[in-house]
Amino acid sequence: MTSAAITPPTTVDRPMTDPFGRTIDYLRVSITDRCDFRCVYCMAEDMTFLPRADLLTLEELDRLCSAFIAKGVRKLRLTGGEPLVRRNMMSLVRSLSRHLKTGALDELTLTTNGSQLARFAAELADCGVRRVNVSLDTLDPDEFRRITRWGDLERVLAGIDAARTAGLAVKINSVVLKGSNEDEIPSLMRWAHGLGMGLTLIEVMPLGEIGEGRIDQYVPLSLIRARLSANYTLTDLPDSTGGPARYVRVEETGGRLGFITPLTHNFCESCNRVRITCTGTIHTCLGHEDASDLRRPLRASPDDALLSAAIDQAIGSKPKGHDFIIDRRHNRPSVSRHMSVTGG
């Protein structure tokens, strides 16, 4: 794809602000719902994916992202599914990198399972990507296979090595699963910090299909923090990225440890983000079923007037907060869509 025909964003007169005064300057875009893993907390093993014809083209994704950048988005994260499995996705990254060069965008990054990083890390760095988040829940090969169902741990570790060699900063995201990897968190933390990588722990979120097994995966991160505090000195850090994580410095390792706790302590008061699916649906809250179609106005006109108005309307309906709960009585999720569709 080429970016020559795409109008660059103009100067932003006023950033996007939701009804509660929160500035929206962070966009997460799922460029595919497909993935080469089948993580137990993310999707079904026999997952039915969207027909490829339903997905926005790479050119449409570029135009959509650029429209948000023109309206004040400063940070753009590409997600999935697994973003690196989408064919020709690097052409999208290279095209979007023009906004880094003009200064319209501060950061272009992505979240990945790491399986394709060895192949793409150098090119990502060449496009101006400076850091990536890698989803990795365990360093035990057998447990890794149980969690991901299809994954190869050595391939992910090779991808992380390639990313670091290419000069990319790497942060590890780990979903803590009761009876699975909860006892491995200290060793995972020491490994990550030993390589100069941050680690962020995430509570299981009630999205998609949840049965008894899924419900029983949940463990509150307050418990994990208490366990860590018995052997490590955790010092709260005042700095925040404006996102959901709350950080501590682990004095014994010198590394940073984050906690994302949507069930036990939500992060809504400082929410600065919206999510777009690979079909052009905008979700202004991860924990609500709210949705607005941006594909229709995107395709209705060659200019962005209709699209811009639709974005404004969606931002204007962003809720104050979510109500994530795990409904044990009815085995119902708070949100019916899978994380792989919403974008992790």
From Swiss-Prot:
Cofactor: [4Fe-4S] cluster
Residues at which [4Fe-4S] cluster 1 binds: 35, 39, 42
Residues binding [4Fe-4S] cluster 2: 268, 271, 285
SUPFAM superfamilies in the record: Radical SAM enzymes
Domain Radical SAM core: 19-239
Keywords recorded for this protein, A-Z: 4Fe-4S, GTP-binding, Iron, Iron-sulfur, Lyase, Metal-binding, Molybdenum cofactor biosynthesis, Nucleotide-binding, S-adenosyl-L-methionine
One Gene Ontology molecular-function label: GTP binding
EC number: 4.1.99.22
Enzyme class: lyase
Family that this chain belongs to: Belongs to the radical SAM superfamily. MoaA family.
Assembly with partners or alone: Monomer and homodimer.
Protein name as it appears in the record: GTP 3',8-cyclase
